[in-house]
């Protein structure tokens, strides 16, 4: 077998392992909370659109591809709502757009905002008074509405992100928290203790987060003090038990596409859901849990993006300093 054939076989095998590693378990076991009794897997791409601020999340790969193959927002709207993004997240602290260098919050200004796209018929009233019309045709209207303001609070031990609903119908129950200097993000959804866990690698930066279900005795950074104290008092024997981690979702950047395209895939949320409409790939019939985890993964994506930007800026500064030192040295030598 030639080297090219071996290489192709290895790539195919690696791809199969990646697919298996990112699979979502379909289970109706009593040991798994009922909200995680899934009957299908959904893949929601996160994309950067040329000329637009922030990042967009699409309800399915099919929806993104439909959007990419048509002109932005000018395609014919259809009742299946395929080809329309579900969410957009923007950074409120960057004065020069998404690629600005600042990340300083002023007063009570939110760090991030999440918008939701909603499709209605022309006969239906707007979903909210703050709804902005994006486009309309075929008796349908596409609205863009503010969904969450995300505030960042830095305490002595934790960094907490609070999702504040911008309409009266959105509950203010979403929050994520991590230890200062660490990447794992704790959250609570449906009163369950969950953690977006990323495995540390000293060699390369790992961008694969798993949403895992915590055991009853494991401390969540969003726990109240009395609950945290009770968990810490649990027996060591119980804590030493090996826990079978149930994974409800994955966030990954493994399938990103070229940045030189006008729509560049930069990440994916892969999650399980229970759906009564197995053929829905657009905005229709998306479960609330899917939307909540979608908003959380968008925040993770932007946090990781800002870290890469800061590293890039620091690297460029070091290069510029080296060039300045070299130029100064050359000038001094020429003067001698």
From Swiss-Prot:
Involved in regulation of invasive growth. Keywords: Cytoplasm. It is found in: Cytoplasm. Present with 736 molecules/cell in log phase SD medium. GO terms for biological process: invasive growth in response to glucose limitation; pseudohyphal growth. It comes from the Eukaryota. GO terms for cellular component: cytoplasm. The keyword Isomerase does not apply. Coiled coil: none annotated. This is Protein DIA1. The gene is DIA1.
